[in-house]
Amino acid sequence: MECKERRLIGDLIALSYVEGLPVAEAAKRLCVTRQGLYKLLKQLRNEGYVAEGPLIKITQKGRDLLSSVLRDLLRYFNIASIRLIGRVISGLGEGAFYISLEGYRRAIEEKLGFTPFPGTLNIKLDPQYLPYRRYLDGLPGIVIPGFTNGLRTYGGVKAFKAKINGVEGAVVMPERTHHPTDVIEIIAPVKLRDALNLKDGDIVEVEILL
């Protein structure tokens, strides 16, 4: 990590709490003047860490820097799990199809230790948890191998054992997915919507075991 990146880390962490807000509101929440925040944003935009526009938006370069800091901190403090919070959203129904496939089902039983309910619970993460989500991309996780059934090839899946509002399950991260980065898919031996009495918009807590 370069010296200039070290100097910007605190500023990026602060901006991560106000991402998506206009400058005036962000300045108020950060307890700084608008002029001071405009000056900081200009510097970060010149460095490529913040995008141009009326709303505060951290670029991929900025997210990568925050993820690297998070990785170092978790390693230093020997943290064995991370917590994500988000809201339940409806999916496209694809999870039920894929989880029902024999190749995936058997591998999940072997690798994760449970027979999955044929379906996934989709969670849209709150913005402040996205660095943790991106951190998972750099971890090996538990590999659910891809397979072919003679007609089609299905890609591999990376998984992490997890607890969803206390219920054991796993976060799955397919090699091929239509979901944006802020959406995670969860599998469990039970239908989580019924077991936890969840509906769209409900807040859930996911503890991911590293």
Swiss-Prot record:
Q: What's the domain of life for this entry?
A: Archaea
One Gene Ontology molecular-function label: magnesium ion binding
- Record-listed E.C. numbers: 2.7.1.161
What cofactor(s) does the depicted protein rely on?
Mg(2+)
User: Which catalysed reactions does the entry list for this protein?
Assistant: riboflavin + CTP = CDP + FMN + H(+)
The cofactor note from the UniProt entry for this protein is: Binds 1 Mg(2+) ion per subunit.
Q: What does this protein do?
A: Catalyzes the CTP-dependent phosphorylation of riboflavin (vitamin B2) to form flavin mononucleotide (FMN).
Protein name per its UniProtKB record: Riboflavin kinase
